[in-house]
Amino acid sequence: MKKLAFIGVLTLLMSFNGIAQQINWVTFEEALELQKKKPKKIMMDVYTNWCGPCKMLDKNTFQNPDVAKYVNANYYAVKFNGEGNDVVKYKGNTYTNKGYKPEMASRRNSVHDLTYAFQVNAYPTIMFFDEKGDIITPVRGYQNPQQLELYLKMFLNDSHKEIKTQEEFNAFYTAFKPEFKG
C-alpha cells in the first residue's frame, strides 16, 4: 500500500514537472498600463488566424520553456491579431478594423488599422517597444527559440543602440552564443 501511495505521489510530482511554462500574454493596452507601474519593454506577436508560420511560432518558440521564462521575466508579452476586431488605444489614437467580417474570422480578413500604423505587411511579425511604449523595431517572419533569443537579449540590454551598420549587426550576430534550448 505504501508503495502504491509513493508511486502515486511520484507520478503527480513528475506531471507537475512536465508542465511547460507559458508566456503571460496581456492586451496591448494592459501592457502600456503595466509599463506605468513597472517599466519593461513590450514584445508584441502580430499574427493572424490563418497564418501557418504564426502557428509554428506559437508551438515551437513561444511554448519553449526558456523563451517563456525569459519573456515573462523581462517583457510584457502581447498577442495582437493583425486582422482582428479589437479596439486599441495607442499614443492618443483609437485603432479599429472597420472592414472586419466575423464570418471570415478564421480566413483572410480586413487588415486592422493598428497593423497599418505599425507598417506590418507580413505575418508573423514580432514588434518590440521600449519602456515608454515607443516602437524599437519589427522582426518579420518565423523565429526559432535561438533566433528570438538574440533579439530578446539585444533589445533588453539596448545593444541595438550601438549597432549602426549591417556589418556591426553581422558581427553581433556572429558573436552571439544562444543559451536557449531548442
Language-model segment annotations:
Residues 38-52, 77:
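Short active-site neighborhood of thiol/selenol oxidoreductases, capturing the structured segment around
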Residues 55-59:
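Detector for the c-type heme attachment site
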Residues 22-25, 64-106:
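Thiol-based oxidoreductase modules, predominantly thioredoxin-like and allied folds used
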Residues 24-41, 71:
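A short beta-strand-turn-helix
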Residues 1-22:
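Bacterial Sec-dependent N-terminal signal peptides
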Residues 49, 82-83, 132, 144:
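Solvent-exposed coil/turn segments that connect beta secondary-structure elements
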Residues 21, 119, 130, 136-182:
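Non-globular targeting/processing and membrane-anchoring segments
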Residues 43, 113-117, 122-138:
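A short, hydrophobic beta-strand/beta-hairpin element that forms part of a small beta-sheet core
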